[in-house]
């Protein structure tokens, strides 16, 4: 048998294909992380010749129809945000569900993603604040009609904000605009980002826990934001030059610290549950309420 650049790496490719990963860029990235020296063409050819390894699609997407005018904004004017839900593989061979918070600058495409065990409002606030630290605070956020943001609309169609979210907007200093009901494609950039996270970042990867997942996600965001995109450029450079002059720096006030540190009840045996893990505290604090914040690599 002849020897090629893929010799010794076909096992990795086969496992990716069996997991449904057919994106050549993703496969090439995984191979290069293991020492592969070849290019994308040979990887594409291998994928095309081994389509029988790819599991069949479970359903086909129906035609979406006319989506109206393209939504455009100025530099630093608006970010889009949304939740996505997916499963992540651990090194223990288990799968667990996570909520993916995604935020993207509508003008330049700079992106930020973070993962949480669920999509509760306290996690929405933490994800938004981390996104604002990463990209600055825009004039307004574009999102859909999630219950943690808006209760309902009045007879004139004006939103009735959820009271805690309304206070959060005042504290941070931004406004919120909502998509029309059943028109999620208005925020198509963040919808595509969530799909890209699932198909690119998560494809074929395993993580120890949510902390390991978020550290890897931040590195991935840095990589994507400093990569040249045809027709756009380098998002990070554009964001600094144009959007950074409009978006304001997040002021770490004492009021914001309360959003970073949600309350937790200390159990009778001296443990605090946070993000699916238990942390021990001195036994004398049992039954009391504490505030917990994720920091660094903890």
List the predicted regions and their residue ranges.
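Short small-residue beta-strand/loop micro-motif enriched in glycine and branched aliphatics
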Residues: 109-114, 150-151
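Active-site beta-loop-alpha junctions of metal-dependent nucleic acid enzymes
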Residues: 113-140
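Acidic/histidine-rich, metal-coordinating catalytic segments
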Residues: 137-157
